[in-house]
């Protein structure tokens, strides 16, 4: 994958938490060679207490969700104004810093808490590494997103285009 992203000419961003500043940093991976892309992706998924921070250029980085769990900023900064935000829980992001952007926000159903058709509650979503439960969540997210979008996506874009 890294060779597909490196030098592709299309922006492809990853968000990492800078441990020195406590702020999010956004890396346009299309501007980096494949080995640096691996470092960036490793850093962007370094969940504290699960994976170690990744050092890049003398700075330690962690999971970007620590400082920006809905990384709209890099896309907004390059001119995008229409976003589909798919949340992993019921907590929404503060999108007020993007006043001229349009958002279609998607939230998962409570079914996301059930595991393997056994009717039992799953462990905390991010830290549940059970492959079966991950597959269940992926399929549930795909199904619910397609169901929602089939009835709303056309309206979302039509309404905005008419303004």
Predicted regions and their residues:
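Patatin-like phospholipase
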Residues: 1-163
């Amino acid at each position: 994958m890294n060779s597909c992203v490196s030098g592709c000419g299309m922006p492809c961003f990853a968000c990492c938490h800078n441990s020195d500043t406590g702020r999010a940093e956004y890396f346009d991976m299309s501007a980096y060679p494949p080995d640096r892309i691996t470092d960036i992706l490793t850093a962007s998924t370094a969940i504290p207490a699960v994976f170690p921070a990744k050092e890049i250029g003398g700075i330690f980085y962690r999971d970007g969700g620590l400082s920006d769990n809905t990384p709209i900023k890099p896309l907004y900064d390059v001119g995008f104004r229409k976003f589909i935000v798919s949340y992993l829980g019921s907590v929404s992001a503060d999108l007020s810093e993007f006043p001229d952007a349009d958002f279609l926000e998607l939230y998962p159903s409570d079914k996301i808490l059930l595991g393997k058709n056994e009717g039992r509650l799953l462990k905390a979503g991010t830290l549940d590494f059970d492959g079966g439960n991950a597959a269940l969540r992926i399929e549930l997210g795909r199904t619910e997103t397609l169901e929602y979008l089939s009835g709303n996506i056309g309206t979302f874009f039509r309404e905005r285009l008419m303004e």
